[in-house]
Design a protein with these regions (language model features):
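Positively charged n-region of N-terminal signal peptides that target proteins for export
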Residues: 1-4
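Predominantly soluble domains enriched in secretory-pathway, periplasmic, or organellar proteins
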Residues: 15-336
Length: 336
């Protein structure tokens, strides 16, 4: 092979890589299980669900700087910086917990449905939406007043959601393999659209400029949907075990954290209807949830070493039990 041709291949291979690599591992004390996490880009703080508490991590220093405790089973955290408030979905207590973003002190609770899971903030209506996994509904909270704004009845089990900033919230319905479009002011379902061939969607993100919704699905693919028509315009292969999907408007990357394979699938939005897999970055098995700092473009993934135990005594057909190996929980930070 000629040197010039070889050089072109090397250059092409370099450009085909996202640049994402592990920057550090941040240890977090405690052996509770985890779910969603989120980042405040203005402060570089990472809010991590961890059993009965939220661990607050300084993303720059890589250390825990605070905790929000006294809850039962935390799923997610949403931030409304304009009101200096954060909101926690406590699935064990069936409520949304409100806290002060600066002091981290809890300041209130709002009753929700059964097992509030995903929680997001909709800037258009100044409302927080908590999606109740076991009562097929969404609880809307007035972020400024800290009071219940209403409830949306859904048809199926909600997973993650995204807001378009124009008065619409979209949510994955896992057991129906659908996306529901909600009027976030009127609190009513406007449309429900099939995701086929995508099955059992979990993670969701959105490019609000191109009006494209990204749904990470259980059958190792990501669906791209037109947010106005509900048409699936593309599907992209991803790793196995996805649970979180993020979109970075600065790089046009769509990111899927796939815990079963232990990879971060990096996809580039070439155009609104065309997408290409850039690479699958090795993370760690079990790293299924993540959060993106849109300012630095760094990604934080929650993970721990988990031991699989046999079903409880007397329940031979029960589910295998899981136990976190002590001292192994923390965050993996990946950057470019």
């Amino acid at each position: 092979m000629k040197k010039s041709a070889l050089l072109l291949l090397v250059v092409a291979a370099a450009f085909a890589q996202s640049g994402y690599h592990q920057l550090k591992k941040i240890s977090i004390p405690g052996n509770g299980f985890w779910d969603y996490l989120t980042v405040d880009p203005a402060t570089d703080r990472v809010f991590v669900s961890h059993g009965t508490e939220v661990d607050v991590v300084d993303g720059k220093k890589g250390e825990v700087i605070g905790k929000i405790t006294g809850m039962k089973l935390i799923h997610g955290i949403a931030l409304a910086p304009e009101f200096n408030r954060g909101f926690i979905s406590d699935g064990g207590a069936n409520q949304v917990v409100i806290f002060d973003l600066k002091t981290l002190a809890k300041t209130g609770e709002v009753p929700a449905g059964t097992n509030p899971d995903c929680i997001i903030y909709d800037r258009a209506t100044k409302r927080v939406f908590a999606f109740n996994g076991r009562s097929a509904s969404a609880t809307a909270v007035d972020a400024e007043k800290g009071t219940l704004a209403g409830t949306v009845t859904l048809e199926g089990k909600p997973e993650f959601a995204a807001a378009d900033g124009k008065g619409h919230v979209y949510v994955n319905i896992e057991d129906k393999s659908e996306v529901m479009q909600i009027d976030s002011k009127a609190l009513m379902v406007l449309n429900k659209w099939p995701l086929a061939p995508c099955e059992e969607p979990s993670g969701m993100a959105m490019d609000t400029k191109t009006r494209r919704i990204f749904s990470g699905c259980d059958n190792k693919m990501m669906s791209v949907m037109n947010a106005d028509t509900g048409k699936v315009v593309a599907t992209v292969p991803i790793g196995e075990g996805v649970d979180a999907t993020w979109f970075d408007p600065g790089t046009k990357y769509v990111l899927d954290s796939c815990g079963q394979d232990g990879v971060l699938t990096v996809i580039h939005e070439d155009s609104p209807d065309k997408y290409s897999v850039v690479e699958n970055v090795m993370t760690q098995k079990g790293a299924r949830t993540m959060a993106l700092n849109t300012k630095t473009h760094d990604v934080f993934l929650s993970v721990a070493e988990v031991e699989i135990l046999p079903p409880a005594e007397g329940q031979p057909k029960g589910r295998p039990r899981r136990r976190i190996q002590p001292g192994t929980f923390g965050l993996l930070e990946f950057g470019r």
